[in-house]
Amino acid sequence: MVYSRARVRAINIKEKISMLTVKDLVKKYPKSERIAVNHISFEVQPGEIFGFLGQNGAGKSTTIKCLTGILPYDSGTIEICGHDMKNDPIGAKMNMGYVPDNHSVYEKLTGREYVNYVADLYKVSEQDRTERMNRLADLFRLEFAMDRQIKSYSHGMKQKICVIAALIHNPKLWVLDEPMMGLDPQSTAEIIALMREHCAHGNTVFFSSHNLDLVKKLCQRAAIVNNGELIEILDLTVEENKTRLEEIFFKATGTYDERLFIDYAAQESADARPDYVPEQEQKDEKEEETK
């Protein structure tokens, strides 16, 4: 069942505990002089779809790998549902589901075996895992392939089995790194619907993307990062911020071109009047006022 954005916002207000809290996060790779993640801080609330935007090398994937416990970080704190990633990593990870950008799965297993393996790690009961696996496999039209080896899957099918595995324990925080990369429109729509449904039940989705249109359509808020630094967090429920998102993103990444933001509708209207001169129109208006 998919709820309206208003319902999602109501859940945000009702719940007080942040699903994800990042404070002053710093990560530097040993053989690099550049700081990959430079004192980043933000919070993500229950019922929220939160976008994480940036170009390649901006620090998105490094931040996500720190959030998920894959990479150690130099300083700062990460809390998932109140569990500190350094002091209580098991508690933090039990509340999180993760879909990586590289299909890190055991390809010699069948889809069903792999999902059951993940369910065992999270101690999901037989009844719950069966119900969730069947429902998600049906949603993704993947029932026919659940007993085939994953190595025989297409790119989209591998992405779907990763999503099923990430949601098998019904995590409060669902983290996805570039989830729509290489997917066909049908698969993209299915994952979008699932993200909205997950949040409608008071859970949270945190995902990285290059796709500004997708983020504007899907997210309540979005953060823009560049060169390891947090540039800005925008509330995308405010309509004017959807335009600002593009401008801030392109300016932050050094790819801003004012031609991208021309009001072409107004330009076409002017072009349809070859004798139109803005200054002359203003002069004519002043003359009319003095009559």
Listing of model-derived features with the role each one plays in the protein:
Residues 209-210:
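H-loop/switch region of ABC-family ATPase nucleotide-binding domains
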Residues 18-22, 26-39, 89:
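A short, flexible loop at the N-terminus of ABC-type nucleotide-binding domains that lies
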Residues 116, 120, 128-145:
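Conserved ABC ATPase "signature" region
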Residues 174-177:
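Catalytic Walker B motif of ABC-type/P-loop ATPase nucleotide-binding domains
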Residues 76-87, 91-92:
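Conserved ABC transporter NBD signature motif
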Residues 55-59:
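Walker A (P-loop) phosphate-binding loop of ABC-type ATPase nucleotide-binding domains
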